[in-house]
Amino acid sequence: MTSRRTRLVMAAVLALLSVASPRALATEAPVGQMSWALHFSLAPTLFEPAEAAGLITPFMIIYALHDALVKPMPEKAMAPGLAESWSRSPDGLVYEFVLRKGARFHNGEPVTADDVKFSFERYRGISAQVLKERVAAVETPDPGRVRFRLKQPWPDFMAFYGTPATGAAWIVPRKYVEKVGEDGFKKAPVGAGPYKFASFTPGIELVLDAFDGYWRKTPSVKRLVFKAVPDATTRLAMLKRGEVDIAYAVNGELGEEVRRTPGLSLRPTPFVATHWLLFADQWDPSSPWSDRRVRLAANHAVDRQAMNQAVTLGYSKITGSIIPTSFDFYWQPPLHAYDPIKARQLLAEAGYPKGFDAGDFWCDASACQYAEPVLNDLQAVGIKTRLRPLERAGFLKAYQEKRLKNIVYGLSGIFGNAATRMEPFVVSSGAFAYGGYPDIDGLFKEQAGELDPKKRSALLHRIQQLIHEKAMVLPIWQLALLQGVGPRVAESGLGLIADYPWSAPYEDLKLKPR
């Protein structure tokens, strides 16, 4: 009898557990600490979704501190976040989001429609101009609903708003921001993500603590520590000593060393980051770069496959495009073969038989490891240039303000589609565009209003063909980062979100039991 009663009680308990929400089941308190060695310097701009700058790097921190209405998650590319659901009107002019009940910021305030409207209107990052030119109004009929009313149907609204193509859908608390001001928010950010701000030492270390009020689940790991370690050898040494659990960007020979080291594992993370060279002076008639033959010569000078093997152990893709291969409306261009003889011939035809001084070669300091082999190949055919690394914040500021000349090492790893990737870099009005071409600008404007998918695809393919024909840029590769993972990690989060290079979602990370 006792045995039968016990079985009935257990069955009842299991039945209750089977219908309980994930949030209700997450009763265990967070424990332990997970640490990362990062390949770039830490700056307060990383806490600020309103300043997302066309790179995937800031989302490493944004995914922890903040939450979006819609965002990429393990189950899908556009998963419900602070919005439980969303819909589009039949005429394509209105997008309505229903907010998640019970979602709160770290200071206890509820996430409301007013916060969503405020976050959009305050957004000033990548593609802000495009969004605000096309949105007629943001309406808040009640605290739990938001409507975006467009000036005309725009097929890319969710590509720009519902993915990390921009930071516009990541929500900050209006009352708190207005109380502390913009500088105060960067000093002590408050978000609605799974982790809350604990401390920050500029350029050195960021510490975040688990937020037990996060709507999706309580994180398993109590504390996250991000350490800025620009030197790759030092990052690997820290991983081997157990000072960090994950070391980002341990490339080339260091990646091989991770493979050989007992207890460590190498995790390649292919993602949507494409790298290229911008010939910033191609619109200056007095510059050698204004001659298409010179730009073609540079394209034939670079041995991309050798670079891929040496730096990323062959995990990157040579695509010939600034558009990731997985993006909607991607067009595969013919690849420029590595041919230094042809490169020299093209330079001679353009009037530079002995090459020329190409001036400065600008790069984000964290990307210089990729820029150096490109520079060496250019030098080998007579294109003489000098590497000029800048700390990331300074590089992005100078890049956007159009203060960089000659050659710029460009890159982007944000989500979206072919249109969202091209808009900041190829269209003449783009945030990082140093010039443009009327035919490309005209086609881009035309595709933005085209609702027929086949016609739109043809327009976007034609733009990509023109970029290739003009040799407007020097595409390098679609990067795969090599990440080192230490022995304490049960779930690193690497690869959980498709095409995303960092650990995420942070609330899913786990340490091994002691």
Regions found by a protein language model. Name each.
Residues F40-F59, L82-A83, E109, F157-G167, ...:
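A structural "hinge/loop" feature
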Residues R23, A29, V130-Y176:
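Surface-exposed binding/hinge segments that line
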Residues P285, R292, K317-E349, A367-Q369:
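Structural transition elements
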Residues A29, E84-S127, P141-R147, R235-M238, ...:
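Aromatic- and charge-enriched surface segment that lines or borders ligand/interaction sites
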Residues Y63, M73-A77, P164-P219, R223, ...:
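Gly/Pro-rich hinge or "lid" segments in bacterial periplasmic/extracellular proteins
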Residues R100, R122, F211-E257, K384-R386:
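Ligand-site clamp/hinge motif
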